[in-house]
């Protein structure tokens, strides 16, 4: 027989996971089995970033040296990267876009931007040398590679078939991703999306 505590815990669980709860559970059939899932959760990583930008707007999300980026700043920068990839670099749904750089705020923003653009982020090992990077690019069929200065230099003179966009990671995020987004400040791209307006 359940104790009073068991009953209270079950009631709390049902409030949280039941209809209208913050973690509403549903089920989905996969491979002949019914599996539980959170039915009101964002469906992909780009939607998660939008969700957390709306929830935590100005709270710090990424830190690199002296640069601190809020959830809102990361989301807006990633939207600009996505627009730049589509409009400026012709990225279409399913295109593989390589990422060859060290850990940095611009890596995270570029990764999210690739996903928002519909691309498939192809992560290339930052320790690889030119031939290894080229092999990874060729094997993945990446049409575009976003690289930091050091990784881009390793690819010079090595055949790989991709367009390389070089980012200067010593710059603040807006300037670091400018080779992707373009130098113009399109107000439509800079305006906060509905999730981030307060």
What are these regions (language model features)?
Residues 37-41, 50, 58-112, 129-134, ...:
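Conserved AMP-binding/adenylate-forming core of the ANL superfamily
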Residues 57, 179-198:
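Conserved pre-ATP/AMP-binding loop-to-beta segment of ANL
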Residues 97, 114, 145, 198:
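Conserved S/T- and glycine-rich ATP-binding loop of Class I adenylate-forming
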